Design a protein with these regions (language model features):
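C-terminal ends of transmembrane helices
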Residues: 62-73, 121-130, 182-186
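Membrane-helix boundary/juxtamembrane motif in polytopic membrane proteins
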Residues: 125-148
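Cytoplasmic-side transmembrane-helix entry/capping segments in multi-pass membrane proteins
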Residues: 75-86, 104-110, 133-139
Length: 189
């Protein structure tokens, strides 16, 4: 039995929720546990690799960014967990090894990707479709996320914090790749 089912059962037996609310609470608790587990596991990775500030930055940017910008999403929670951790490792650990890349190349590609996302985001995924007026809200929020990414990039550029600059750049590359993959899927069929 899943934890979410156990807690929903306890809530129903103690008359905290009605029988017709069981599935909603079970689903909500499952989502809560998955999200909390991902965040806690990510923070532990940040602590173990001595990259906690970069991990927290990653979480603060990627969680709202992926929710708003769209793009391809994994079909299962397990696949999402593995892919998310892979992206976390890439965005947090790779900048240390990429500090030799020209700031001009990174900046130029960052601007191109920002313009690309500004034009095409958000992109709906069949595994996570927009509901109701969510697309309209996501269009507005995606512009805010893109502007915030640009502001963070500029701040790290002027403060000469190359690892953080590269992390923001890698996150933008990640967002762009997931969106382009989803667009390719839509045009291929």
């Amino acid at each position: 039995m899943k934890q979410s089912e156990y807690f929903a059962d306890v809530m129903q037996k103690n008359h905290v929720i009605a029988a017709d609310e069981y599935e909603l609470y079970q689903y909500s608790l499952n989502a809560l546990f998955e999200m909390a587990g991902n965040i806690i596991f990510s923070i532990l990775i940040g602590v173990l690799f001595h990259k906690l500030p970069m991990t927290l930055l990653f979480l603060m940017v990627v969680i709202p960014g992926r929710s708003v910008l769209g793009g391809c999403h994994a079909k299962t929670a397990g696949a999402c967990f593995v892919l998310s951790l892979s992206v976390l490792f890439g965005c947090v650990l790779l900048p240390f090894y990429l500090t030799g890349i020209s700031v001009w190349i990174v900046s130029f590609s960052f601007i191109i990707l920002e313009v690309l996302l500004w034009i095409i985001a958000p992109v709906e995924c069949k595994n996570k479709p927009f509901i109701g007026n969510q697309k309209k809200r996501c269009q507005i929020y995606s512009k805010v996320i893109i502007l915030l990414l640009g502001a963070l990039f500029m701040a790290f550029l002027f403060m000469k914090m190359s690892e953080y600059l590269l992390e923001i750049w890698l996150i933008l590359v990640y967002f762009s790749v997931t969106i382009l993959i989803e667009l390719h899927k839509k045009t291929s069929f």
